[in-house]
From Swiss-Prot:
The keyword Amino-acid biosynthesis applies. Belongs to the pseudomonas-type ThrB family. It catalyses: L-homoserine + ATP = O-phospho-L-homoserine + ADP + H(+). Keywords: Amino-acid biosynthesis, ATP-binding, Kinase, Nucleotide-binding, Threonine biosynthesis, Transferase. GO terms for molecular function: ATP binding; homoserine kinase activity. Its EC number is 2.7.1.39. It is an enzyme of class 2 (transferase). This is Homoserine kinase.
């Protein structure tokens, strides 16, 4: 979400003339992230986020925006894309597709506790179930085919144990993806990037008995149809880890997984392959961060993430230490 593409005041005025969202009060770039150009937009009608898509094409974009509209209609708290005067959910700005969505209430919780993980686990399961009847389809663009394509471009920059791990884990995941158990895993639309900075929390009402309230999930632009367990693994690998070591925190992990399965119970196949999917979730982000680190794009406010973080997480998932895991009635 770094600002790769700047927007001038006259350009913004012309863009906003195609919306019925009132007059612009404030407009500023968002510096976090590395994929799209994002801006906070406040008008006399409300608060929004303007996104210019740096990689996604106009052909790909309807999947993401229509999914967000579908989830919002099913009472899942997500940003709702705003239609233009012609009814379209996106247009063209600087020759790139761009859209405006509603801004969620609250702020990210960068040091989540058990209660935050419970809220996220329940809502993630609700989101998965709400997406079952979504008719759009887009594969997870950062899954195995992308790993196969990208890893050879990264390997020349690595040596020794790093190089060996990147290659050996790809082979492990190829075998896992080809298995009958993998094929049997439940699937559907997934967020696929549900890190702690992609959710908002607000203060809960005093009469609820809770300290926090989930404001919603956002940044769906890595979403795709994939195994739901992959989405859970990606989420756990961020929300439930010690950031310094990559080790899973038992209390947060158990809280998130138990909360998730109160809404959607895990299957026996999911239970068997929880460890494999935790590795897949870590590998996906190690590969993408290595790629962004060694093959960066020029950007106005680029802040690349440390690839070593997910290398540590992947190595932790390989240690053989008993992991906090999922539970099914088959145990």
């Amino acid at each position: 979400m770094a600002v790769f593409t700047a927007v001038t005041e006259p350009q913004l005025a012309e863009w906003m003339s195609h919306y019925d969202l009132g007059d612009v009060v404030e407009f500023r770039g968002i510096s976090s992230g590395i994929e799209n150009s994002n801006f906070f937009l406040t008008t006399t009608r409300g608060e929004y986020v303007l996104t210019i898509f740096e990689k996604l094409t106009a052909e790909q974009l309807p999947f993401y925006l229509d999914l967000m509209r579908h989830l919002a209609a099913h009472r899942v708290p997500v940003p709702d894309p705003m239609p233009r005067e012609d009814g379209a959910l996106f247009g063209t700005l600087h020759g790139k597709p761009a859209a405006i969505v509603t801004k969620l209430e609250g702020a990210p919780e960068l040091a989540p506790g058990v209660e935050h993980c419970i809220e996220v686990g329940q809502m993630l399961a609700r989101m998965h179930l709400a997406g079952r009847d979504y008719t759009g389809y887009q594969p997870n663009l950062r899954s195995l085919p992308w790993w196969r394509e990208t890893v050879p471009t990264i390997l020349p920059f690595l040596q020794g144990e790093q190089r060996e791990l990147l290659s050996s884990e790809l082979a492990h995941q190829e075998a896992f993806f080809a298995s009958a158990d993998y094929a049997a895993l439940p699937e559907g639309p997934c967020h696929a990037d549900l890190f702690r900075d992609n959710a908002m929390f607000a203060h809960a009402a005093p009469d609820t008995g809770h300290e926090v309230r989930l404001g919603g999930f956002f940044d769906f632009y890595f979403a795709g149809c994939d195994k739901w367990l992959f989405d859970v693994a990606v989420t756990v690998n961020d929300w439930c880890v010690d950031l310094a070591t990559g080790k899973l925190d038992n209390a947060r992990t158990e809280a998130m997984l138990r909360a998730y399965q109160t809404v959607r119970p895990f299957t026996a196949e999911e239970n068997r392959h929880w460890g494999d999917m935790l590795r897949a979730g870590a590998y996906r982000f190690w590969v993408s961060r290595l790629y962004d680190f060694y093959l960066p794009r020029a950007a106005e406010l680029l802040k690349p993430h440390d690839p070593g973080h997910f290398e540590r997480i992947l190595r932790e998932r390989l240690t053989g230490v008993a992991l906090p895991g999922i539970h099914t009635s088959c145990n």
